[in-house]
Structures are given as structure tokens and as C-alpha cells.
Amino acid sequence: MNCGRRMLLCALFFFTIAWAGPVEAQTEQGRVTRIAEIEIDPYQVEPYKAALREEIADSIRLEPGVLTLYAVSIKDHPEQVRIFEVYASQATYQTHLQSPQFKKYKAATQGMVRSLKLFEASPILLGAKK
């Protein structure tokens, strides 16, 4: 992905999370919000991104309880990936972890991931325009 497109995706991600007005605000009631901080082997960034794109597309399409999956990399550090995740409930999060597409992603990327940190998050306000 070229630098301009990566910058646009990062800008869209942070605009949506931090600056978008509450046109359709989500409440956190019952929802699970997580942030994943991932470091990828720099020599395997492109295969990792391909596997991640497939997993996100399939999860959003196939799992009604997967509400939001945003993946970005840190500018000038494509091996540093952050994923913002919102699930309808703890049960749908657990279902996602057992889904065929997530298991496929984990198996495919196992040797690519140098470190993984998961954080439970408490939304202040999640706003997005339709």
C-alpha cells in the first residue's frame, strides 16, 4: 500500500474515532471494545496484511456480532499494526474467536507476529456518519 493511501486510512480511522460528531453514537452497554497492538516481522508485512484483510472482510460479512474492525499501521512503521474492535457482546466476541476465518488468520499469521498486546477499552464516545 502506498504512503498516501496509508495516511488516508490512518486519518479516516482517527477522524472516525476521535473527531466525528455523534450523528449515530454507539453506547457501550453490553458491547466489548478492544484494541490490539501487534508487531509484525518486517519481512512479512505484506503477507500479514493480506491475511488480515481477508479475516476482517469475512468477519464483518459473516458475523452479525462483529460490529467494527479497523486496522491501521503506524506511519513509516508498517510492521506496527493497531486494530480497533467492537463486538455486540462478550458472547459474540467469544464466538468470533472460534470462527473459521479467525482460526485461519491465526494459523496463517502465527510465524509473522513478533508481539501481541490486547487491551480492553472503555469507549467515551464512538461517532460515525452513515
Residue ranges of model-derived segments:
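An amphipathic, aromatic/His-enriched active-site/gating alpha helix that lines ligand/cofactor pockets
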Residues: 27, 54, 58-67, 86-120
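N-terminal targeting signals for Sec/Tat export/insertion, comprising classic cleavable signal peptides
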Residues: 32-62
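Glycine-rich beta-strand-turn "strand-cap" elements at beta-sheet edges
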Residues: 2, 8, 15-32, 70-77, ...
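Acidic/polar helix N-cap motif
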Residues: 41-44, 77, 89
